[in-house]
Amino acid sequence: MSYTNTFIKVADDCPVNKSEIPLSKKDKKPLHLIQYELLKENPYKFDHEGLIYEVFVKTKEIPGKILEKDAEKIKTALFSKGHPCLRASALTKRYGFGAHYDDKGKIAIYPMESKEYEAFMAGKTVKIIPAMKTKK
């Protein structure tokens, strides 16, 4: 699912009062850490599908030569099934980041304590939806 002009606010049951940068104790980075790095370094570069694809490529460590040759085949296989949006990401549920989708569906993340986050929450220019709660 992809959104436009939408802000995903931090989950109501988020355990932090201030955003935290995700860390990993393992060699292989978890999905939310890769999402964080991509969105922090490239705000409004990726839409939902682009983000999923980049995270997949980084997670599977697919070499550039294979991507050059088989990118379409990889995308077709990847998107043959559904993928959760950032409402279900640990970034919005656990680490205290809101996600903004602009009018083209491109995504940027904002710490919950930032002025930008407050502006999205106070303004009427975007639809505000909550991240999914961790507990039911």
Explain the meaning of each model-derived region.
Residues 96-100:
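Short, surface-exposed charged micro-motifs
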Residues 1-72, 76-85, 104-106, 110-125, ...:
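Non-catalytic accessory regions used for complex assembly or targeting
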